[in-house]
């Protein structure tokens, strides 16, 4: 078990926020993660369309807050699009996924990300375009996730707790997969 997890579980971990996102976690004790309940091919209007899908599903489930997709394009890495939080990332039921951003991008997570915004179990692959360290997969990205016919893109899997959660395979852009959504 990771040392920070033990401290957090014992209620002994104080949250100091002096990193690059200083102030962004003020008043926030955790950031929620879910997987979409719908599947779509690689053409969902780039990162903006993916973010809109996450926001829509969060709103439909009455989740407060801003949600964005865990999705990188070659020109827009997730590490530059999402809040790099110093608080834990959890599923919508409270299950711990990672202690903080650095833990999220260290190659393993504590539990599979397999619950949708309504806490229903969902399985399968997930469009990510993102390597385990939060940087983009540089070989192809379905033309910035705006094409369902050209190329391939990186996907993860909801069944994994190792690096495969975000970097598992490179299916054709016509494949219908889910997205991960993370509270900002």
Feature map (PLM): residue ranges:
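Sec-dependent signal peptide recognition
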Residues: 1-8
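C-terminal motif of bacterial Sec signal peptides marking the signal peptidase cleavage site
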Residues: 11-14
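Secreted/extracellular ectodomain signature
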Residues: 16-184
């Amino acid at each position: 078990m990771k040392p920070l997890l033990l401290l957090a579980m014992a209620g002994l971990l104080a949250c100091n926020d002096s990193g690059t996102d200083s102030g962004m976690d003020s008043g926030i004790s955790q950031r929620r993660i879910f997987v979409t309940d719908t599947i779509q091919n690689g053409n969902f209007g780039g990162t903006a369309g993916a973010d809109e899908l996450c926001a829509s599903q969060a709103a439909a489930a009455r989740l407060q807050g801003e949600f964005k997709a865990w999705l990188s394009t070659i020109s827009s890495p997730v590490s530059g699009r999402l809040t790099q939080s110093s608080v834990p990332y959890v599923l919508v039921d409270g299950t711990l996924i990672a202690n903080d951003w650095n833990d999220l991008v260290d190659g393993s997570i504590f539990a599979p990300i397999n619950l949708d915004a309504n806490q229903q179990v969902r399985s399968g692959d997930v469009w990510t375009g993102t390597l385990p360290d939060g940087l983009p997969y540089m070989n192809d990205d379905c033309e910035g996730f705006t094409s369902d016919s050209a190329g391939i893109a990186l996907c993860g899997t909801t069944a994994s707790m190792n690096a495969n959660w975000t970097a598992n395979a490179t299916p054709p852009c016509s494949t219908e997969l889910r997205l991960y959504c993370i509270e900002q």
